[in-house]
Amino acid sequence: MEQLSILDPNKFKHVHFIGIGGISMSGLAEILLNLGFTVSGSDIRSSNITSKLEKKGIKIYTGHSEENIKDADLVVYTAAVKSDNPELAKAKSLGIPTLDRATLLGEIMKKYPFSVAVSGTHGKTTTTSMISLIMLKSALDPTIHIGGELDAIGGNTRIGSNKYFVAEACEYVESFLKFHPYLAVVLNIEADHLDYFKDIEHIKNAFLKFIRLVPENGYVVACADDQNVLSILKDVHCNIITFGLNSKNAMWTAEDISFNENGFAAFTVLKDNERITNIQLKVPGIHNISNALASIAACYALGCSIENIKKGLESYTGIHRRFELKGIENNIKVVDDYAHHPSEIKATLKAARSGNYPRIWTVFQPHTYTRTKFLLDEFSKAFKDTDKVIITDIYSAREKDTGEIHSRILAEKIRENGQDAIYLPDFEGIVEYLKKNASPGDLIITMGAGDVYKVGEMFLKDKQMVAVS
């Protein structure tokens, strides 16, 4: 298929998305609808996302069937869709052009002269959201594509003008190599997605290829605190901007850091050791200072004023599933977080600990068998800042259970490291356990990239709390 004609509504009038209920796919569907395409899509189950798309005029099919693609001129699919999917298989047998999600996102990015791609093992969604709010405060009218729901834009996608585009850039299966960034942010590089990558060197090489996509007049915004990030900056022929909390050589840094009773950080921003402004964040944790510095560096390079940068960051109150307050029952606060990598867990729990709760209860749902198996030792040491860990069954996502790893093993490993941990397989049992044991003033965190957030929702719905003496 001719790549330049992908976004021509005269050539491909009807685009069908397999897995349209996914956070990225739904956003891309909205963008194509806005560009004048007829859009349809299918998913295995209906959701709030698919309902929202239907209201916008997108035809949604529940379940996958050959019939769903009968009018399609182009079929878009995700990495999670297998080759034997009936819709994908039928499209190929009929000669209907097919396209993976990352290629489509890259082609959309091509349309914008100033495209920002935010990469890193952790912090992508938060940083993309921060950058988006700063650009909105700066009246740049960006088109935004986020891997989470941001209340300020009413979801995960915003259609703006044809100049600025902001999106996350995920390294899984090297999909970000299909992007066309003018400015690339690299927040950190750690071992993850080991069902695809061989080792950390393989991952670093993918990030190196990614930042080499930036043109000579473009920018790479890189974390100077991360040695893996620093190691790939050699032989990159574009403007390099660094940020960091612990590196004296970073261009953008922070000092006078303090935290209020909610764990929200206040700090002074420095550029080349010169004090620029003071920021008061409305999200907890020192890791969010680093995300804020990355956002400041990126937006300043794009010409945003310090005044608008400050306004944007101070208006950011978080996104859904990132330390999201779900509710309070019997003076027990329930928070949900997307953390599913050891470093993310550590950062989230460190932020939670700064809130001075009597006890922190962490309900963790491991995400994928390969990640749990390969990072088992790191996971077992990641819960130092919680009082009790409840491990539920592994969320398989795209994988099959080979029997090599189980949540019981992780719970045992955590106990071996001196932490109080138990394995409870079902959500109902976890809710009953929390009702009997959590006390007023405590914090409950549901944590993981699957559906563990339902535990918190079930806990809050059940008003029959058991009194704890």
From Swiss-Prot:
It is an enzyme of class 6 (ligase). Its EC number is 6.3.2.8. GO terms for cellular component: cytoplasm. GO terms for biological process: cell division; cell wall organization; peptidoglycan biosynthetic process; regulation of cell shape. ATP binds at residues 120-126. Cell wall formation. This is UDP-N-acetylmuramate--L-alanine ligase. It comes from Acetivibrio thermocellus (strain ATCC 27405 / DSM 1237 / JCM 9322 / NBRC 103400 / NCIMB 10682 / NRRL B-4536 / VPI 7372).
